[in-house]
Amino acid sequence: MADRSAIQLIDEEKEFHQSALQYFQQCIGNRDVGLDYHVISVFGSQSSGKSTLLNVLFNTNFDTMDAQVKRQQTTKGIWLAHTKQVNTTIEIDNDRPDIFVLDVEGSDGSERGEDQDFERKAALFAIAVSEVLIVNMWEQQIGLYQGNNMALLKTVFEVNLSLFGKNDNDHKVLLLFVIRDHVGVTPLSSLSDSVTRELEKIWTELSKPAGCEGSSLYDYFDLKFVGLAHKLLQEDKFTQDVKKLGDSFVMKGTENYYFKPQYHHRLPLDGWTMYAENCWDQIERNKDLDLPTQQILVARFKTEEISNEALEEFISKYDESIAPLKGNLGSLTSQLVKLKEECLTKYDEQASRYARNVYMEKREALNTNLNSHISGTINEFLESLMEKLWDDLKLEVSSRDKATTSFVESVAAGKSKIEKEFNESMETFKKLGLLISNEEITCKFSDDIEERIKQLRDAELKAKIGRIKKNLVPELKDHVIHLLSHPSKKVWDDIMNDFESTIKDNISAYQVEKDKYDFKIGLSESENAKIYKNIRILAWRTLDTTVHDYLKIDTIVSILRDRFEDVFRYDAEGSPRLWKTEEEIDGTFRVAKEHALEVFEVLSLAVTSDNVEIIPDVPMAEEESGEDNEIYRDNEGVFHSRRFAHILTELQKENVLDQFRRQINITVLDSKRSIITTRTHIPPWIYVLLAVLGWNEFVAVIRNPLFVTLTLILGATFFVIHKFGLWGPVVNVVQSAVGETRTAIKDKLRQFVVEDHEVKESFEMKDFSKNEQKEK
């Protein structure tokens, strides 16, 4: 059967065609057929005109017998052809369905003789996979038992019931009996009744399996009958009858339309091929195995002997031929193929004379031994190739343009490239039959590449974490220290807000969703989450270290003293206070002390404004342990808590308060001394002395209009300042002016002294130079 339009689906050796799916794909091209296809089989006696009928009806090109030469078997096995052109009486304009036609080897042929195993299995297969089974028979065969294949149909019905009878679906097969050479003497209805009675009788007498005892023939099959005129004697009528038959395959919606929904297997085309192959496998395995005969035993012994001789000769030539070529794929594969073919040819020449099944069995074993020996060389070559490809991958990743190509893209591209090259090399060995199974090698290659990519990924991750740490740690320290050095009642709220925002700012480039991050190195969601957790651990440890290192006793005392002095020494506008009375000092002292101690408890225990203790949301220790939150004693016998929020112990708090009280008390005493000094600085009699001694000047001022005007202005200014209590700001302005004047005078004097000193030094250097010249 050489026609390109058909393939041998099952050959005469009962082997299913492994490229059936590719054939279907070639037939339909890129079209999405879905369920819009149909399968038809033809079944009947050998040389009964089955292939001829199919060719005329479906425009196929199955081989047919030339009766003028010899009546013999033409169709061997089961052949499959595709068509969309059905011979009909009218033209069908709409798109016709895809029809796949199975031409089954004829039954009752002399070539197989009494071996009816294949024809039974072929008939059963045709019923199992087809929607319509055309039973081709001659009119004169009706009424016969063997001649019209009733015995075969009985066997097929029995096996069909045992294999497929328990299915709960409503699938049926249409048995279309085509009665050939129908001359019309006996009406078609009479012939159909005869065949129907025979089939019903056969079904009644079947040995039905459990669960199918009450089943009917019509539960599984529908019956249709068509008569065709004699092809040679009534050629025109035969053609017309065939066209009428074709109408029933294309006229949808009519009563005689053959492709009814219940006949379809409801499988896509590629699913049907798998179903057909499984059916044939199930049918083929349903047999008894025969014991080997003496002839088979001899064949096994001789083929084993020939195989060993060929293998020994192969091994003797192998090493010296292969060693120089291990680094060149083309030369290596050519030599391996040559050695292998020489070995198999030697075996074939001698062993092919024995039983074919034994010969092929031993040949397969020899081929396996050869491949096993060759696999060592192939593995060595592929391992060397793996190292080279890995070096290429590392180079490509390290030399990538980081501005335009991400790590993941670079690794993916490099991995794809080396996998392609590796697979191409491996496929070369496989196509040449040198490598039977590549699963182990592929797995090893994949595992090795994944492990090495993991190393690259770890290095990239380490670099990313390093960059994040470089920015995160100092930024976090600076912000925390700044907030703690100027604390408020809500300082811990501010610290935690700043803590979260600092983390977020440093890893915002990797955020994909809320609380979800992708660090762009090809990690899974859980792995990215783990890295994010590690970054938080780093941040929390930095926060913990910064807080506990900064908030020592001396630092807290200094913070409290600064807060005290901000209120005690300066008013609300930031101006220095001028004390008048001790009561004013004492009142301000109490306010300043309260202001300072507002944050004492805040700095002793890290709690939010809602009085909730701050607890890290990640483990602070290297490993979780039950000791993390326990109290421990230091070398000096002082108890401490391991909790982040616990900053000062009770003993440390007392120490802070003692130091703070001492320092602020000193400040208050100094302020009170300044009042006493101011009050006792000028004795009252000085004012009397000034009045007596300055009387002449006073009279001179009164007599001079200019002096009088200045006196009035100064007096009014003095009154206003005194009336509204503006002496404090005036004193501040005067002090500032005096201070600036003093500073300016000092700078001028310093500049004058420095310049004078430089002039003297220059003169001395000139004198020194002259003296040296004189000495020379």
Swiss-Prot record:
Gene3D superfamilies: P-loop containing nucleotide triphosphate hydrolases (3.40.50.300). Residues 703-705 are lumenal. It is a multi-pass membrane protein. GO terms for biological process: endoplasmic reticulum membrane fusion. It is found in: Endoplasmic reticulum membrane. Pfam families: RHD3_GTPase, Sey1_3HB. GO terms for molecular function: GTP binding; GTPase activity. Coiled coil: none annotated. Interacts with RTN1 and YOP1; GTP binding is not required for these interactions. This is Protein SEY1. The lineage of its organism: Eukaryota, Fungi, Dikarya, Ascomycota, Saccharomycotina. The gene is SEY1.
